[in-house]
Amino acid sequence: MRTIQAKDVTRAVAQMCIKANCTLQDDVVSCLECARHEEPWPVAQATLDTILENVRIAKTDNVPLCQDTGMACVFVELGEDVNIEGGSLRAAIDEGVRRGYTDGYLRKSMVADPLRRENTKDNTPALVTFDVVSGDSLKIILAPKGAGSENMGMLKMLKPADGVGGVKDFVLEAVRHAGPNPCPPIVVGVGIGGNFDHVASLAKRALVRPLSQPNPDPFYAALEGELLDAINALGTGPAGFGGKTTALAVHIEQMPTHIACLPVAVNINCHVARHEEVVL
């Protein structure tokens, strides 16, 4: 059994909150630069130039990439041989979010109740997904998720007979419906399988995969490529001004499901596809 101090979790989460909001991951920056190089439309080129300049300024001045510093979405992989000492793991994560958003002067966007709408004033609670795994390490992935892209998510319970074609049609429908609202170029997370609640989590988890890393299953990797081509053929373009770069990547995560089910969920990230990871 390995012991990890709750205060170390808090410290790591606080640091990730600030870094994720101010420094875009290298893989995302590389995709944006590649899109700028390949984009023939002058307005789209200028839009991508502005996006890349914003990325540079945010990193240099350590200021947020976007005014919407998001909900703190956290994925936790807790080793079976790990003991958290000095407090609960969830409380340690929330305290890290509280400190990170306060010390980093990041906008607090969480309301305590969806209808009463009173701001919690510290961006807690974090939205945490726990997964117990083998081993003696603790992995934490933090992804600040803004509302502009989150509000464009869609979920549908397809019929098994709808098959691959039905999945493609639904994903394209979701992206077409989103239009410029999620601040393209976007990253599209697609969950397939499980049940109503699990498929949405799959779609969100797909968004934290490195953009250069396709699905390990060749069948789904090919489907990711087909969907990316189809989405970019829509012509929405950067910021919705037109162009060939509507999406930077499509990521699919799949899991077993019931013989009578074919759940599909789409979760979209804007071009500020923020996330950080730490292993303790």
Where does each model-flagged region fall?
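Non-transmembrane, aqueous-exposed alpha-helical and coiled segments at domain scale
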Residues: M1-L280
